[in-house]
């Protein structure tokens, strides 16, 4: 206890022992890219504590997708879209110090897309697909050579076995149909498409 005034003199004191805290994490060893993994945890569950999926070898203050233990046990976390080696970690909220960790393998996922090689401009393209079919995933009809974050007309793969119907652009040319993951727009399947021009003719009497 410090008194006010010059020098803040100590008027009273008592010993204090600070004990360390611990945590543990239990989860599957692997998860598909973009999937959800359930993590059972033990730990202090203090305000701001969080459990994260981080790149292998990342420092304590570097973290990826995360959730708060207070949200539940087990805690559901979304895996990254990029396959590779990661680590699950329990961080203290105030210092980000890691109390517990365990390795996690994020496996690659793929998709297939089937449709006619040509389509008429302005028409509708029915795309049969296989893939994760997660909420927010989408199938797009894009300009050939477009970046993953650039997409054109699209549809959601709503139900397995039901083709996704996408409106074909009005401009003929070379395009690509792509399956994008929801969170990163990462492409896990693609196939080329040629959009062909359509013509029309009119016949009528010369005068009425």
PLM regions with names:
Residues 1-208:
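Extended, solvent-exposed regions of the mature portions of secreted/cell-surface glycoproteins
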């Amino acid at each position: 206890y410090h008194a006010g005034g010059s020098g803040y003199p100590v008027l009273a004191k008592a010993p204090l022992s600070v004990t360390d805290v611990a945590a543990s994490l239990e989860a599957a060893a692997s998860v598909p890219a973009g999937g959800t993994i359930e993590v059972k945890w033990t730990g202090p569950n203090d305000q701001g504590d969080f459990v994260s999926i981080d790149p292998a070898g990342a420092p304590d203050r570097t973290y990826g997708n995360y959730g708060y233990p207070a949200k539940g046990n087990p805690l559901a976390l979304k895996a990254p879209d990029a396959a590779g080696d990661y680590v699950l970690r329990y961080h203290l909220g105030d210092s980000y110090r890691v109390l517990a960790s365990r390795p996690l393998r994020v496996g690659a996922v793929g998709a297939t897309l089937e449709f006619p090689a040509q389509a008429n401009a302005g028409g509708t393209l029915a795309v049969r697909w296989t893939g994760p079919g997660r909420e927010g995933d989408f199938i797009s009809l894009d300009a050939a050579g477009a970046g993953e974050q650039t997409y054109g007309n699209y549809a959601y793969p709503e139900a397995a076995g039901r083709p996704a119907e996408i409106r074909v652009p009005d401009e003929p040319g070379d395009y690509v149909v792509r399956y994008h993951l929801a969170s990163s727009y990462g492409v896990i399947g693609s196939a080329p498409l040629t959009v062909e021009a359509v013509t029309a003719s009119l016949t009528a009497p010369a005068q009425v």
